[in-house]
Amino acid sequence: MSRFLSNSDISRLNAAKLGQSVTLGMDSFDCLCRAKEMFGKTGGAFDISIGALYDCWLHEDRTLRQPSPTEIQHAHALTGLNHLELDEDGFCAEVLTEGLQFDLGGIGKGYAAEKVAEILREWSLGQALVLAGASSVLSVSVPEGMSGWPMKLRNPENPNEVLGRFELKEGAVSGSGRQKGQHIIDPRSVDVGPVKGRLAAWSVAPDAIAADASS
């Protein structure tokens, strides 16, 4: 599901022409459906069709560039999941605006964590904690005798400093931050570029996909 692999479903969708129907694997299609659901729930704040804005605002090493107003307007015209149509009967996707660039980075780890949890439940290993990298955690279930999995939220500028502690009983927690570059962009307005004010944000949600997309 990576846009950096030339033969992936997402890369094929990114290369699709206007009106072309692209048949996807079940996981890719399901992930796109959940992404579109979160797009609606967040009022467009979470948007996987943000690739054009990434290319507009960021160099390849994720350092900030200064695009012209024309570049910004063009990138915004190529952003928005309202430009993507999904066919649940045929597991197909069609882009309604040519040039859209999709990136599942904001939801992919959460989706993978949910798939791992499904397998663990099938194997009757429900008392487990799924770690998806350093930023997403999913509690499948808490072992008997525990009130919850101990969680720590650390200062992104000083990992030795613990900002908060809590116990995760059910659901997931996910975090996003700027320590690896200014890659967090609000796609809803042409007047807002990469986030500069806050260093990090965390989200707790009933499932890992919602937590990942909301953070």
Residue ranges and their predicted role:
Residues 1-215:
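Mature catalytic core of soluble alpha/beta enzymes
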